[in-house]
């Protein structure tokens, strides 16, 4: 098979799995296909803020296309060129989390932790930092800007993104990209943001991270 034929088949696979009709919101258990790169050094990431989409590419070949939740107007996701670093599969927020005592668990900021309380940061699994204090991580993917500037990825997809992106991988964040009109058009979007929040006792536990671990191969077989 020629390289061009492989590229066309790969696009078709993404189209069948990642595209839907006019209703772009996924009903049920959300996931996104991912493919192992031939050369990890050629992997790059594009983030379209207008399309709330992440494109992981090996040169021009799509490896992963998925929805993301971006920063609010008052706390926007930074634009520009970056590189991935500080990958942490079990990251907790240094700013927002919970004040824990024997009497209860109360949401709060780290810098406002009352005396006698223990601060436990909100879980941000599969953290990939691209600028100090900003990163990709697992979380609810709302259909509107909702974060403090980070880029949230559905919990089923975040392990794949984490595996594809290495320290030093180039990341471009822009208002839009040409891919928005091709591989990113009518992208499937999760509805996990409608789910009730897990119990606070669960969020402060290691079990939260344990339950998000994906077993087995994360990647699809390349089309033959």
Region locations from a protein language model:
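Extracytoplasmic
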Residues: 40-42, 49-52, 63-65, 79-81, ...
């Amino acid at each position: 098979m020629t390289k061009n034929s492989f590229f066309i088949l790969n696009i078709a696979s993404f189209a069948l799995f990642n595209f839907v009709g006019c209703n772009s919101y996924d009903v049920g258990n959300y996931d996104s296909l991912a493919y192992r790169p031939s050369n990890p050094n050629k992997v790059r990431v594009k983030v379209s803020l207008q399309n709330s989409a992440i494109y992981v590419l090996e040169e021009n070949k799509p490896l992963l296309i998925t929805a993301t939740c971006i920063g609010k107007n008052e706390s926007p996701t930074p634009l520009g060129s970056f590189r991935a670093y500080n990958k942490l599969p079990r990251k907790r927020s240094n700013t927002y989390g919970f004040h824990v005592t024997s009497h209860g668990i109360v949401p709060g900021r780290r810098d406002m932790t009352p005396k006698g309380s223990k601060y436990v940061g909100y879980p941000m699994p599969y953290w990939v930092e691209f600028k100090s204090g900003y990163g990709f991580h697992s979380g609810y993917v709302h259909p509107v800007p909702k974060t403090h500037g980070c880029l949230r990825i559905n919990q089923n997809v975040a392990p794949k993104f984490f595996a594809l992106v290495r320290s030093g991988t180039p990341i471009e964040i822009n208002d839009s990209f040409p891919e928005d009109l091709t591989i990113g058009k009518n992208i499937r979007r999760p509805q996990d943001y409608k789910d009730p929040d897990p119990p606070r006792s669960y969020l402060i536990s290691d079990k939260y991270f344990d339950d998000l671990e994906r077993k087995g191969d994360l990647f699809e077989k390349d089309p033959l």
